[in-house]
Amino acid sequence: MSSTFGKIFSVTTWGESHGPAVGAVLDGCPAGLPITEEMIQAELNRRRPGQGKLTTPRNEKDTVKILSGVFEGKTTGTPISFVVFNEDQHSKDYADIAKWYRPGHADLCYDLKYGFRDYRGGGRSSARETIGRVAAGAVAKAFLKTVAGTEFLSWVSSVGTVDSTSINVSELTLDQIEASPVRCPDADASAKMEQAILEAKSKGDSIGGVVALLVKNVPAALGEPVFDRLDALLAQAMLSIPACKGFEIGSGFAAARMHGSEHNDEIYVEGNTYHTRTNNAGGSLGGISNGEPIYCRMAFKPTATISQLQKTAGRSYENGELAAKGRHDPCVAVRAPVIVESMAALVLADLYLQQKRNCLD
């Protein structure tokens, strides 16, 4: 099982949904970076469960503890360890699925691969694994902010068939995003998204959504062609998030309907800095950052756990039916933005250090 991401600035996550704790070990962070538990906690609070009627009622404080790698408020250059203890597991809710496979979940595939699985809350495949990613991502964000002024913003751009239409990304702020219960800064769309989520929830169902990401002040020249291209690593990072089923950068799939004369971003110079007049490339050309903002979108499937009765099969090769129990989000996209930001930050921090290794200046 692969639980490590990154080459220089690398994170290893550990723990299961219903185990005693989850966490991460971050290696490769340079010494001297100011880091506090409060900084990391602020990020974890954005993905924490129990935030209201639109998220799972599982009540976890997700209080983070730094175990190593930070002394007197600064990184020491040694591995940074984070731990968050699980406090509100209801493992009895999963007793029925010890022998049945939940449709849409990783249960069957884990059994096919390992011949054994932790069925409580999905075990390692649970979204609680992303706690370690967010903790490490908070450090990556702080590092990139220090060295390059890089900023990350992510929001829900659609839920089901409801799309946001009036978001001015050039003036968008985190406060505007977090003011919405669905993390959509378009007030009209936000209200309709909330209604769509509650309607699905009332039927014992769930609903999917799309999460957008904007990264500003990205250093140019990040990315390692040909196989560690910036866009390829971002795709890998995003698609590794539980429930993420699609990725596009820049104009994405819309590029297939365009002509080159439309899609090419014209280049101009201002002082000694190159810019483009449009950003169909999404900040990456040839797998290398061009200094423009990174813009990408991720599709998140509907939460697999629903209370409606579904046909399934069991470990003893019998057919049956299952209505899943447990506490789950009716729309996972609502809690995904901070995870998306964290994974993007981990990619960029690692590529930044790789670029410093490759070049003298």
At which residue positions do the language-model features occur?
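Alpha-helical support elements that line or immediately flank enzyme active sites
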Residues: 20-32, 128-150, 154, 228-236, ...
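Internal helix-turn-beta structural module
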Residues: 10, 303-361
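Glycine-rich, N-terminal phosphate-binding loop and its surrounding beta-alpha-beta segment
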Residues: 43-103, 107
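A short glycine/serine-rich beta->alpha loop
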Residues: 10-13, 118-129, 220-224, 279-284, ...
